[in-house]
């Protein structure tokens, strides 16, 4: 939940001076392909003021991979996926954390940093996947499948994590599922709430998967025809897909893996042309670090992530508003599930999904 009363926002009226232009020049070099010069005259003073407020208030901003480039490159102290950001928040000396992401991410940061003030710039920044399941749903699932370990994707609320045996990310889901099956001495595991992630994991393991019909609205919209059209238009482009996409997308891709794995792939392989089958801003942000690579659509935009702006980040810092809290009992149990995952030996590299590996039978039971 989030506490506090919002103060009516008053747009920051900064002036684009030569000093601000010089100070923000390195950021401009990274965002200039995605931000117009006119937009930059508004954004640059905001970036300078937000960074000043961070120093004044001992605050840090966690910028998710799906943030717009002005946020990601301009004010993000830590950038990456939701779990990586929460872990960085826990290590940071900052007393105030502003979550430039959606609400479940702010909850995860609170779970790992209960002593810190966690702010979210917009209370309406939700998530279709996280809202697809509740803690009460998980309790009913456990009654239906007694003794079967519950593995929960980190893209869930603290209430759901609290009912979970261990959490996972898209990068380590196969590893966590196989660990849970071995630890519980069973051949089946409940993997919730993303149905497509569960089905894609099932293709990588012999463990039987019990899944929930939750979906990310961004990745669900992609179709195999999208990829076919892109290959026809750009025959040399390499296609990288996120495992929250339907299996037909992964089958049509050249590579599938987490956002971290995609980033590493582009950095290592340096493809001339690449298509990232994920949220739009991911390509925009990776492009700044890989200028020689041409990034081609399609992409789908997350309306929830895009609720976060420089202006409401500024408002959150100025007024220290929209603090995210988690009930103490829920927090302790949720932290146990996340910590179990963190304590597992990390893979040497972010996991990729083997698109060649053929399973004679993929056993997925949909709840």
From Swiss-Prot:
Show the GO cellular component annotation of the record.
cytosol
Domain of life, per lineage: Bacteria
Under the GO molecular function aspect, what terms does this record hold?
Answer: 4 iron, 4 sulfur cluster binding; metal ion binding; quinolinate synthetase A activity
Q: Would you indicate the residue range of the signal peptide?
A: none
List locations, semicolon-separated: Cytoplasm
UniProt-annotated binding residues for iminosuccinate: 64, 82, 153-155, 170, 242-244, 259
Matching entries from Pfam families are given as: NadA
Q: What is its main location?
A: cytoplasm
Q: Which residues bind [4Fe-4S] cluster?
A: 127, 216, 302
Q: How is the cofactor bound?
A: Binds 1 [4Fe-4S] cluster per subunit.
Which keywords, in A-to-Z order, does the entry hold?
4Fe-4S, Cytoplasm, Iron, Iron-sulfur, Metal-binding, Pyridine nucleotide biosynthesis, Transferase
Its GO biological process annotations read: 'de novo' NAD biosynthetic process from L-aspartate
| The keyword 4Fe-4S appears for this protein | yes
Name the EC number(s). 2.5.1.72
InterPro entries, alphabetized: NadA (IPR003473), NadA_sf (IPR036094), Quinolinate_synth_type2 (IPR023066)
Q: What SUPFAM superfamilies does this protein's entry cite?
A: NadA-like
Question: What's its job?
Answer: Catalyzes the condensation of iminoaspartate with dihydroxyacetone phosphate to form quinolinate.
Q: Which NCBIfam families match?
A: nadA, PRK09375.1-2, PRK09375.1-4
User: Which family does the record assign?
Assistant: Belongs to the quinolinate synthase family. Type 2 subfamily.
Stored HAMAP family: NadA_type2
Q: What is this protein called?
A: Quinolinate synthase
**Whose protein is this, by species?**
Caulobacter vibrioides (strain NA1000 / CB15N)
């Amino acid at each position: 939940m989030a506490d506090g009363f919002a103060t009516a926002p008053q747009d920051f009226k900064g002036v684009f001076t030569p000093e601000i232009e010089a100070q923000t020049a390195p950021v401009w070099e990274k965002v200039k392909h995605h931000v117009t010069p006119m937009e930059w005259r508004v954004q640059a003073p905001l970036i300078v003021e937000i960074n000043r407020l961070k120093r004044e208030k001992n605050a840090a901003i966690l910028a998710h991979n799906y943030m717009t480039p002005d946020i990601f490159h301009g004010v993000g102290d830590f950038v990456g996926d939701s779990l990586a950001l929460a872990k960085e928040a826990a290590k940071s000396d900052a007393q105030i954390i502003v979550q430039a992401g959606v609400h479940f991410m702010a909850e995860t940061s609170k779970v790992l940093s209960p002593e810190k003030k966690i702010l979210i710039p917009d209370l309406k920044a939700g998530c279709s996947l996280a809202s697809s399941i509740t803690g009460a749903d998980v309790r009913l699932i456990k009654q239906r499948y007694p003794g079967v370990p519950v593995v929960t994707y980190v893209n869930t609320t603290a209430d759901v994590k609290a009912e979970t045996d261990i959490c996972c990310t898209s990068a380590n889901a196969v590893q966590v599922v196989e660990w849970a099956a071995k630890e519980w001495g069973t051949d089946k595991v409940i993997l919730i709430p993303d149905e497509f992630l569960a089905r894609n994991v099932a293709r990588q393991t012999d463990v039987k998967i019990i899944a929930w019909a939750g979906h990310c609205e961004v990745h669900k919209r992609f179709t195999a025809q999208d990829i076919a059209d892109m290959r026809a238009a750009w025959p040399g482009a390499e296609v990288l897909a996120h495992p929250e996409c339907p299996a037909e997308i992964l089958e049509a891709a050249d590579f599938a893996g987490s956002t971290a794995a995609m980033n590493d792939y582009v950095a290592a392989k340096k493809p001339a042309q690449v298509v990232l089958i994920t949220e739009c801003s991911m390509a925009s942000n990776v492009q700044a670090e890989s200028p020689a690579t041409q990034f081609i659509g399609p992409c789908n935009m997350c309306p929830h992530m895009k609720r976060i702006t420089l202006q409401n980040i500024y408002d959150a810092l100025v007024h220290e508003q929209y603090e995210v809290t988690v009930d103490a009992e829920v927090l302790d149990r949720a932290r146990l599930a996340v910590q179990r995952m963190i304590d597992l030996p990390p893979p040497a590299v972010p996991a990729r999904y083997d698109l060649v590996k053929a399973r004679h039978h993929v056993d997925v039971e949909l709840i």
